[in-house]
Amino acid sequence: MTSPKDVLRKNLKLIHGCPITYAFANNWEKIEQFQSRPDDIMIVTYPKSGTTWISEIVDMVLHDGDVEKCKRDVITAKVPMLELALPGLRTSGLEQLEKNPSPRVVKTHLPIDLIPKSFWENNCKIIYLARNAKDVAVSFYHFDLMNNLQPLPGTWGEYLEKFLTGNVAYGSWFNHVKSWWKKKEGHPILFLFYEDMKENPKQEIKKVVRFLEKNLDDEILDKIIYHTSFEMMKDNPLVNYTHLPSEVMDHSKSSFMRKGIAGDWKNYFTVAQNEKFDAIYKKEMSETELQFRTEI
């Protein structure tokens, strides 16, 4: 029987060439064989791109903005993470998904190549939320400081090098966003940008409403915007991850919901780091029309 201490602060494990959090990487065939339902809705993000934010928005849209219904459980139960496994600590994502009624909402950080094939076979709707790489790198660094399921991040400079080479959980940010952007040409994928959502949440939430074939009036939309604002979510124990054991997430090192802004990278990148990042970014993104804003 695996105990929590067996999976904490372990090196990432390669699954089909992609580095995956050690605790999640056992029994991978169960992930591959996962049977989706045709009305499943999948939320996909690269880590630290607004996953919890869009998850709560989708839950509120599906429940017509009913705040009480959305308080029915913690976010990790309402929107289970497909690959989540915390041996000896809590229900796995797969076990939680089996319990949840349809239409289920499932979240994942997996790259396209690791998505269970049943999601493609069932033509499940997918919402992909992308965030600019500089802010993701800073947020991921702080996340790895407090998330004991991840390897220790080292210094910010050391971590940035790992991020740029894709030697972090879920691999290369560049490959992740580019492949999902391309995939939307042949699959029902709503591709959203974190920066657009910060700038004009109503406009972006309306896209979610249309995509999920709901019909919500302005009053309900305003309620959803209010209840999914960063300030409200940071103080909401159902979504701010304080419900997880401190041996897994140590909020004394960094809070799960830290700042929730665009442009915080400027407080961390040195001039040299920024120049190197920009050069690699230009090369990696040269073949795609996908564009990001690093501030709003």
UniProtKB/Swiss-Prot annotation:
Chief location of this protein within or outside the cell: cytoplasm
Catalysed transformations (reactions): a phenol + 3'-phosphoadenylyl sulfate = an aryl sulfate + adenosine 3',5'-bisphosphate + H(+); 3,3',5-triiodo-L-thyronine + 3'-phosphoadenylyl sulfate = 3,3',5-triiodo-L-thyronine sulfate + adenosine 3',5'-bisphosphate + H(+); 3,3',5'-triiodo-L-thyronine + 3'-phosphoadenylyl sulfate = 3,3',5'-triiodo-L-thyronine sulfate + adenosine 3',5'-bisphosphate + H(+); 3,3'-diiodo-L-thyronine + 3'-phosphoadenylyl sulfate = 3,3'-diiodo-L-thyronine sulfate + adenosine 3',5'-bisphosphate + H(+)
Binding residue positions for substrate: 107-109
Pfam families: Sulfotransfer_1
Active site residues per record: 109 (proton acceptor)
Cytoplasm as UniProt keyword: yes
Subcellular location(s) per record: Cytoplasm, Cytosol
The EC number(s) this enzyme carries: 2.8.2.1
Gene3D superfamilies (UniProt xref): P-loop containing nucleotide triphosphate hydrolases (3.40.50.300)
Amino acids binding 3'-phosphoadenylyl sulfate: 48-53, 131, 139, 194, 228-233, 258-260
Gene Ontology BP annotations: 3'-phosphoadenosine 5'-phosphosulfate metabolic process; epithelial cell differentiation; ethanol catabolic process; flavonoid metabolic process; sulfation; thyroid hormone metabolic process; xenobiotic metabolic process
Classification via InterPro entries: P-loop_NTPase, Sulfotransferase_dom
Tissue specificity annotation: Expressed in liver.
Coiled coil: none
Enzyme class: transferase
This protein's GO CC annotations: cytoplasm; cytosol
GO molecular function, one term: aryl sulfotransferase activity
Keywords assigned by UniProt, alphabetized: Cytoplasm, Transferase
Family: Belongs to the sulfotransferase 1 family.
Described function: Sulfotransferase that utilizes 3'-phospho-5'-adenylyl sulfate (PAPS) as sulfonate donor to catalyze the sulfate conjugation of dopamine small phenols such as 1-naphthol and 4-nitrophenol. Also catalyzes the sulfate conjugation of dopamine and thyroid hormones, including 3,3'-diiodothyronine, triidothyronine (T3) and reverse triiodothyronine (rT3). May play a role in gut microbiota-host metabolic interaction. O-sulfonates 4-ethylphenol (4-EP), a dietary tyrosine-derived metabolite produced by gut bacteria.
Protein name per UniProt: Sulfotransferase 1B1
Source organism of this protein record: Bos taurus
